[in-house]
Swiss-Prot record:
Lineage of source species: Bacteria, Pseudomonadati, Pseudomonadota, Gammaproteobacteria, Pasteurellales
Organism of derivation: Haemophilus influenzae (strain ATCC 51907 / DSM 11121 / KW20 / Rd)
Subcellular location per the Swiss-Prot or TrEMBL entry: Cytoplasm
EC assignment: 3.1.13.1
GO CC aspect terms: cytosol
Enzyme class: hydrolase
Limits of the S1 motif domain: 576-658
SMART domains: CSP, RNB, S1
Entry keyword Ligase: no
Protein name in the entry: Exoribonuclease 2
Superkingdom: Bacteria
Length: 659
């Protein structure tokens, strides 16, 4: 009698409409229930309802009330957590194909079918790319996926590389070449092959894109300064704007440097052979003449030329550093001219380091961590590598060359691709001011610092540099690490703007055109100005792609490293391995620390820090944890930790602090 009763249907609709409706994101737990996190409140989701949703789904829900208890009932899908995703193949007990999503918070198997384009026979544990086809909240059907690509087999030792590249939709292959290569601009080059250029790089480097030559400037037999000549490989000599290689480089934007190997932006026969500044081979180059006084000030406008150059020696960072540091049994240069170049470059570098410490910003020394891999991809060891004097020689030469390129492009071309950084995010300037005052001000200097660190002052390049110089001598990294969270991101722009991170008025990279697309663009602009040819301002879509590619490459490198750290540390749990570490992040859930010996990131759950979670408070302004009202841990603290658990499946490394 009540079937199809319009009054009853209307009543049901009214009851439904009267219920509170919310939007939020689903958070799963390791139990069958979950939660819906909304802007101001979190609601319980019961186990039957959790079967309709997945961790990370953005949904609409109605709130059901029973007494003083509230729970969310999922109603509609706004945005699914999964569209394209990485997974492992699984067969259930009925031999039905399923996929297990590669995500630490999603553990339900999803039924799947193989796309016709995937010809391989899939096996348990294989890594695949899949797409979610049906979702219970959207399609009134259970979760179901299509497998579109086999990434690699379950037992592939290089899975961390292939899976991560697939996740970020990056190619594992170099760009295809286009033999034969013809030089497009031969006529306008000067012959500089007589100059004694040298390259300084890692021993294994093949894609050498910079060579250096230096000589003193003298007046009346007294040295007054330096003339540095920076020669940079010229791949645009071989690459036409309308070529396939150009289009691929424009999409990739960077050579991808991964643990163990790289994936070049250009075909290897260009990056490692034709364009690489190989010793005793004549190569096309874009060359910049730079003049400074003895204290490192630039004293003349930079002078650019297209040229042919010939590196006279391929030198290695460690050997040159050993030689300059006069280490026992150190390598010795083969030619006196090479020795002379090394010593002059060393003197120039010391002057430029001092100049940057005074006039711009100089970075605190932090090591790079290098994975030493066996043939099969197994991690043999992880080395902390510090920048030594030979690395600094190249770094200072490249920095001054990029300062000069920014000046040249701004004045001559009125455009370019500039590396910019505007310091503190405008919305955090007040926070930065308050934080500096809370940590550095006292009764004596209160008035002076209030002006020195005023919001207006911190927003200027000079004010920002002044503040950084003030905190530089402080031994702890706490101030620097906390202030870093208030900074904005670096950006590529087509007009000159300051780079607060470097403390410079302008910066435009052109010294790595084999490895960076932005540098290729700047090469073309510089060469167009020199040849008095027309040129175009770099398009916004190119700048946006550079930004996105840089972000992607960093994620790829980090994800592979996290996986390799798990493999490396897994067998060290049983031995209760202990490490010195620095606190990198402070959250309600616990601490994230970095192991100083190898760079691995470790999570310390709050439950291991104190047995009563009600007595643990997070101070988000200080990035500090308070226990029983006392500040106990803050970002930048040095702690001793031990490993307690490594899970390769979720790439998580867990530890605890040794009191």
């Amino acid at each position: 009698m009540f079937q199809d009763n319009p009054l009853l249907a209307q009543l049901k609709q009214q009851i439904h409409d009267s219920k509170e409706q919310v939007e939020g994101v689903v958070k799963s737990t390791d139990k069958a229930y979950g939660f819906l996190e909304c802007d101001k409140k979190t609601y319980f989701i019961a186990p039957p309802s959790m079967k309709k949703v997945m961790h990370g789904d953005k949904i609409k829900a109605t709130i059901e009330k029973q007494g003083d208890k509230e729970q969310a009932e999922p109603e509609a899908l706004i945005e699914p957590m999964l569209t394209r995703f990485i997974a492992k193949v699984r067969f259930n007990k009925d031999k039905k194909l399923q996929v297990l999503v590669d995500h630490p918070s999603i553990n339900q198997p999803i039924g799947a079918q193989q796309a016709k384009s995937v010809k391989e026979e899939l096996q348990e544990g294989d890594w695949v790319v899949a797409n979610l086809k049906t979702h219970p909240l959207r399609d009134d059907r259970f979760f179901y996926a299509t497998i579109n690509q086999l990434i690699c087999r379950a037992d592939d030792e290089l899975a961390p590389w292939w899976v991560t590249l697939a996740r970020h939709e990056q190619s594992r292959y170099p760009v295809r070449g286009a033999e034969p290569y013809e030089m497009l601009d031969q006529k306008t080059r000067e012959n500089l092959t007589a100059l004694h250029f040298v390259t300084i790089d890692s021993e294994s480097t093949m894609d050498m894109d910079d060579a250096l030559y230096i000589e003193p400037i003298a007046q009346n037999s007294t040295q007054t300064g330096w003339k540095l000549v920076v020669a940079i490989a010229d791949p645009t000599a071989y690459i036409a704007l309308d070529s396939q290689i150009e289009q691929e480089a424009k999409q990739r934007c960077f050579t991808n440097y991964l643990p163990g190997f790289n994936i070049p932006m250009l075909p290897r026969e260009l990056s490692d052979e034709l364009c690489s500044l190989i010793a005793n081979e004549t190569r096309p180059a874009l060359v910049c003449y730079i003049e400074t006084d003895l204290t490192g000030n630039i004293t003349a406008k930079p002078h650019f030329v297209s040229a042919y150059v010939q590196s006279k020696a391929k030198l290695a960072y460690n050997k040159v550093s050993d030689y300059l540091e006069q280490a026992d049994n150190a390598w010795q240069p083969e030619m006196p001219e090479t020795a002379q170049q090394i010593h002059w470059l060393h003197q120039f570098t010391k002057a430029r380091i001092q100049w940057r410490k005074t006039h711009s910003l100089f970075f605190k020394e932090k090591p790079d961590y290098a994975f030493v891999l066996a043939e099969n991809g197994k991690v043999q060891e992880i080395k902390a590598e510090y920048r030594r004097i030979a690395n600094q020689i190249v770094e200072e030469a490249m920095i001054i060359a990029n300062i000069c390129a920014a000046q040249f492009l701004h004045e001559q071309a009125k455009t370019g691709i500039f590396n910019t950084h505007s310091g503190f995010d405008k919305k955090f300037l007040e926070n930065a001011h308050n934080f500096l005052m809370a940590n550095l001000a006292n009764e004596q200097n209160q008035t002076e610092l209030a002006e020195r660190y005023s919001v207006e002052n911190l927003a200027t390049l000079n004010g920002y540099c002044q503040m950084r110089h003030d905190i530089e001598p402080i031994e702890s990294d706490y101030l620097e690490l906390r202030l870093r969270r208030y900074l904005t991101f670096a950006e590529f722009k087509s007009e000159l703007a300051p780079h607060f991170g470097l403390g410079l008025e302008g910066y435009a990279t052109w010294t790595s055109p084999i490895r960076k697309y932005s540098d290729m663009v700047n090469h073309r602009l510089i060469k167009a100005v020199l040849a008095k040819q027309p040129y175009e301002k770099p398009q916004n879509d190119v700048l946006a792609r550079l930004q996105e590619a840089r972000r992607q490459n960093r994620l790829v490198e980090r994800d592979i490293a996290d996986w390799l750290y798990c493999r490396y540390l897994a067998d060290k749990v049983a031995s209760n391995a202990e490490f010195e570490a620095e606190v990198q992040d402070v959250m309600r859930a616990g601490l994230r620390v970095q192991l100083l010996e190898n760079g691995a990131s470790l999570f310390i759950p709050a439950a291991t820090l104190h047995n009563n979670k009600e007595e643990i408070q997070l101070n988000p302004d200080e990035l500090a944890l308070y226990i029983k009202g006392e500040r106990t841990y803050k970002i930048g603290d040095m702690v001793k930790v031990k490993l307690t658990e490594v899970k390769e499946a979720t790439r998580s490394i867990v530890g605890e602090i040794l009191q």
